[in-house]
Amino acid sequence: MNPDLRRERDAASFDAEKLTYILDGGSERTRRRREIENLILNDPDFKHEDLNFLTRSERYEIAVRKSATMVKKMRDFGIADPEEIMWFKKPQLINFVEPVGLTYSMFIPTLLDQGTTAQQQKWLPPTQGLQIIGTYAQTEMGHGTHLRGLETTATYDPKTQEFILNSPTVTSIKWWPGGLGKTSNHAIVLAQLYTKGECYGLHAFIVPIREMGTHKPFPGIIVGDIGPKFGYDEMDNGYLKMDNYRIPRENMLMKYAQVKPDGTYVKPLSNKLTYGTMVFVRSFLVGEAARSLSKACTIAIRYSLIRHQSEIRPGDPEPQILDFQTQQYKLFPLLATAYAFQFVGAYMKETYHRINVDINQGNLNELPELHALTAGLKAFTSWTTNSGIEACRMACGGHGYSHCSGLPNIYVTFTPTCTFEGENTVMMLQTARFLMKSYDQVHSGKLVGGMVSYLNDLPSQRIQPQQVAAWPAMVDINNPDSLTEAYKHRAARLVEAAARNLQAEMKHRKSKEIAWNFTSVDLVRASEAHCHYVVVKLFSGNLSKIDDKPIQAVLTNLCLLYALYGISQNSGDFLQGGILTESQLTQVNQRVKELLTLIRPESAALVDAFDFQDVSLGSVLGRYDGNIYENMFEWAKKSPLNKSEVHESYHKHLKPLQSKL
């Protein structure tokens, strides 16, 4: 054990193990998670070479082998609960890339969400047994986030009671679905439904794409891998082109919308029910953002505790680089953000499951807010995490650029989250639509609930000159609840400003849609402010649920740092709204620096509490034992270029060149 890390852990004021229990939702859940993780971590069947030294084809083959082995092991161990399946997979799937993964993350959830009881009875058993390997084919070459623009067609033929699927243009080719290229034999395809000469919009269809047994594509199916990407080397993201490909009528998922044998269309209770899988995945991605940022912070903070560099005072020993205030300022706000997102992820998972029960009982009242919240928070957390991982990499100096740090892999694996399941700017604009509708409701005298209930107070919140001096005295920068109120007022102000700007644009634009485009920057800002408020509110609200006083004290400091750092980065909003004065902003900046000092001795234990095993962290710099330099040297020696003392290129190219000089 590195002596610096041992000393840092001993100096913490709280028990990291107890904080792990809080993050997991209880000590029993921690025990069970570790029990399941150890089943795979101690299994020799999952040992393999460092993926960094393998070709893409080799990486894909290993990922498929591991996936197949995992399925067998899960059957042997009787692991069937969705959360326990995730616990089992994550230690070996570094950064969560798995060719068969969409079978569990999208294919089965869509079947459960949109399939009838009969369809579930038919398709679930072979899918759970992995005779059916599924993917989710929504995105096309020419359209992604704009779902209504998707071009793939499914035309009903009442004579044969079949749907005829076509990719009518090159831009309609399905593009990007994970596992589609070489792994999957079935896909849930989203296509424009045509029956009796009418188009009824997007619907989901189960489409067999490869023959069972031979795995060859069926006639009418052209399918393959889209080629190398920025990351995700183990994943065979694919393309799918269909030419007059027929499937039975029963392959349309018909829990909500239906097509009768004669072609009669029965519409669903709500068109948004079709988007249930996306809402599920977006709520899941908030938790993944927390996990990825927590990993990056763990690596960067442990490295910063081990790395000694430069001098603070001439002649003194080289300090740990985490003793530099600038390094703390880079990393501790991100650490606070990682904890904030942990609580937001837990809230989103709980909220999705609660509202999904209501939806299955026909109660759609909370669906609009769930859709808006998952869209906005998916964008907010993934944008923040994406830039945060890169900040952690740069905080590790030159070594952060090496794959041995694990940070490049975390980054390239996470960064597509900003564009898949909805491009983030468009997601923010979807949230903005809900905010504008809620604002209009309040403006017309109705009350709104949920996370937008702060809009009910808008008439009394409109800042008048005499109120500006009175309001700031109410903000206590050492009180998370008071800071939550400040964020609430900021969100309300920016939502109202966007609504007024939209109304002003509508007066001299040709249509509401054009006015919307000319207000879109303001609308995105309003959505960001709303999401920022939600995160502060949820972080602050969880503090009172913590009984352990030392842990509560440390998390309170993290919550304060998260909120105050956010104010310092968006100071104009708080000044313009009359929420804070200039002198208070000076106090905010000073308090941020004080909090860095308070968090410094707790930092090792705070990242230990995330409880990442070295295998799942995949980093030499972030090793639990801190022995980074010895292992960095051993890692480098494994490079394929080092297999021979003299590389063959010397004899082929350099030696002949030198002989002619």
Curated annotation (Swiss-Prot):
It catalyses: dodecanoyl-CoA + O2 = (2E)-dodecenoyl-CoA + H2O2; octanoyl-CoA + O2 = (2E)-octenoyl-CoA + H2O2; decanoyl-CoA + O2 = (2E)-decenoyl-CoA + H2O2; tetradecanoyl-CoA + O2 = (2E)-tetradecenoyl-CoA + H2O2. It is found in: Peroxisome. The modification Phosphoserine is found at residue 649. The modification N6-succinyllysine is found at residues 89-90, 159, 241, 349, 437, 446, 512, 637, 643, 655. Keywords: Acetylation, FAD, Fatty acid metabolism, Flavoprotein, Lipid metabolism, Oxidoreductase, Peroxisome, Phosphoprotein. It comes from the Eukaryota. InterPro entries: ACO, ACOX_C_alpha1, Acyl-CoA_ox_N, Acyl-CoA_Oxase/DH_mid-dom, Acyl-CoA_Oxase/DH_mid-dom_sf, Acyl-CoA_oxidase, Acyl-CoA_oxidase_C, AcylCo_DH-like_C. GO terms for molecular function: acyl-CoA oxidase activity; FAD binding; fatty acid binding; palmitoyl-CoA oxidase activity; protein homodimerization activity. Pathway: Lipid metabolism; peroxisomal fatty acid beta-oxidation. A motif (Microbody targeting signal) lies at residues 659-661. GO terms for cellular component: peroxisome. Belongs to the acyl-CoA oxidase family. Involved in the initial and rate-limiting step of peroxisomal beta-oxidation of straight-chain saturated and unsaturated very-long-chain fatty acids. Catalyzes the desaturation of fatty acyl-CoAs such as palmitoyl-CoA (hexadecanoyl-CoA) to 2-trans-enoyl-CoAs ((2E)-enoyl-CoAs) such as (2E)-hexadecenoyl-CoA, and donates electrons directly to molecular oxygen (O(2)), thereby producing hydrogen peroxide (H(2)O(2)). Isoform 2 shows higher activity with hexadecanoyl-CoA as substrate than isoform 1. Homodimer. Interacts with LONP2. This is Peroxisomal acyl-coenzyme A oxidase 1. It comes from Phascolarctos cinereus.
